[in-house]
């Protein structure tokens, strides 16, 4: 679901507080810029997934901060370093109670750069399309 207003984001946060777990991914642009420019945030709880478009639909970033930094909610990332970098640049802090599935794969014999697509194939037998992996996330409409 594309989040169009703060009310929708508040409802999602309330559901996430009950679930106590979310998955987070960001899309950004970092060509010819020192700091990455946030273009999209994707968050899923146990019942729904949302897309936050900070370019076309300005949302109260305080609400995003509340979700991402709620220590009672476990955050799941894959290859979190760049997500953490952009979140730190926005909010000046690193999320707590977070897990990086890429790091979790390392004790199982995977290297430190195992892709999300590889993990999905190996563990879930699901092939993930990577056709949009290198698109310019600044371009609208999505």
Per-region residue spans from a language model:
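Conserved RNase H-like, two-metal-ion catalytic cores of nucleic-acid enzymes
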Residues: 1-118
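A short, charged helix-loop
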Residues: 118-142
